[in-house]
Amino acid sequence: YRQIIFFKDYFFDFFEQQTEKVKEKIDHVLFVVTVAKRIPQKFFQHLEGTNGLYEIRVEFQGNIYRIFCCFDEGQVVILFNGFQKKSQKTPSGELAKAVRIMNEYFDEKIKQR
């Protein structure tokens, strides 16, 4: 099993804005991410051009949601910001925010040693 860690409130700020049905779908996909030996690409994909940033992919009633994350020490999935995707390309602002949050996570981890 993979452990999911929520870094600060970035994920929850996104999650709390969703309807109950969307929250249920997100919970289901997060469960798959924790238990699947190999996470299906339908739910999980590395973002090209990033240093270890992934997106968790959630689709519900024609709407597409993305939640950024990364691995730490092999098994832990750290959840960052999420957003509703409205076009084919991931918005550069959302991607830049995720990279900034990922760097913030690892910077804080280094300081704690």
Per-range role (PLM):
Residues 80:
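ATP-dependent carboxylate-activation loops
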